[in-house]
Amino acid sequence: MISAADGFVSANVHSSVSGTVTAVGEVPDAGGVRRPAITIAVEGDQWLDIIDRSESLVKECHLTRDEIITRIKNAGIVGMGGATFPTHVKLSVPVGKKAEFLIVNGVECEPFLTADHRVMLERGAEMLVGTDILSRALGVDKAYIGIENNKPDAIEHLRQLSAGYPDIEVVPLRVRYPQGGEKQLIEAVLGREVPSGGLPIDVGAVVQNAGTTLAVYEAVQKNKPLIERVVTVTGRAMSRTANLKVRIGTPISSLIEYGGGMPEDTGKIVNGGPMMGRAVANPEAPVTKGTSGILLIRRKGSVRKTPQSCIKCAKCVGVCPMGLEPYLMYGFARRLRYEELEAVHITDCIECGCCSYTCPAYLPLLDYIRLGKSEVAKILRARKAR
């Protein structure tokens, strides 16, 4: 471990390589924002003796609930769907709340990304053990694995493997973006609606990503911290696409090089998928725990069209999965009217990008909504701290 969590909603960081620390400071992340970082000169590939690197499947877990959560916390496990919320926090159910169901998110609805799909196909047995461990940590009797119908091989594979787990059920889901959003997934699987401003635990659910269940298995059964993850490297501009098991800290440029290098007509590098991903300003930035994919877009497809005036068509309202009014939030955000933004529930926005995608006026709706949401979050934190 090279960096310890400094609060409850925080996660430990482990070195993914053996070597010598050469610098402690700040480096630009993928978006160009300077972040705390530790630089290590790689020296060989030595592992701690307590880490079980064998491929043997360890199904039995005799740890108590508290021991499971402690091991997950020590391993630095976070949500690997992109939000990177510490997993041990999700497993620590607040007083007065009760977890009834665990839902494993195997939807992966973001276009181009297939990392979770490969994990389900190639590490399905380990995933199921991880799911069972998470169920025990939560004290729930039922776990569901939600997978969209466009992954029939994963559905069939996990159904066969889960025959020995009567409390785990694979649920095929309609192909619909953004089906992988927590609240959308809960409604699709359980038929329960998370209230505005609420959390999944408010309706008795805890959601974990498919990749997270694998990381939990490795942490609890193999004593392995979160030092690597599967990343989709893709895009029509690339000569070689793949899902790669990547050490945390690997430069994004190394993944692009593996894919054949940067084509001349590349217009944009995206960290994530085309809907919710963000443009990469620094290709030398490291892969992080939340890096699900690196997407290269050709120049022709990456140029934004000139925004026009809103024509009040309400298409953005019609496609919003949260029932919000994106055009209204866009206007408030542009005018820095944060009280109004809070009043129209901007914090409920899941940043799926449907509004921007469908806007006939090419307005940068999501860009301004993200800015407004960030400012409202600051106001709410300040208010809570008083």
What are these model-derived regions, one by one?
Residues 140-252, 258-263, 273:
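Hydrophobic alpha-helical positions that pack around
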Residues 8, 14-23:
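Generic structural motif
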Residues 23-29, 262:
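Short, conserved beta-turn/loop elements at beta-strand boundaries and strand-helix junctions
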Residues 1-3, 22-23, 253, 270, ...:
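Hydrophobic beta-strand signal
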Residues 291-307, 317, 321-386:
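Ferredoxin-type iron-sulfur electron-transfer modules in oxidoreductases and energy-metabolism complexes
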Residues 72-84, 95-127, 189, 219-309, ...:
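Conserved mixed alpha/beta catalytic, RNA-binding, or beta-rich assembly cores of soluble enzyme
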Residues 1-8, 25, 36-41:
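Short hydrophobic beta/alpha edge segments that flank linear recognition/processing sites
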Residues 32, 38-104:
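Hydrophobic alpha-helical hairpins/lids featuring a short glycine-rich hinge
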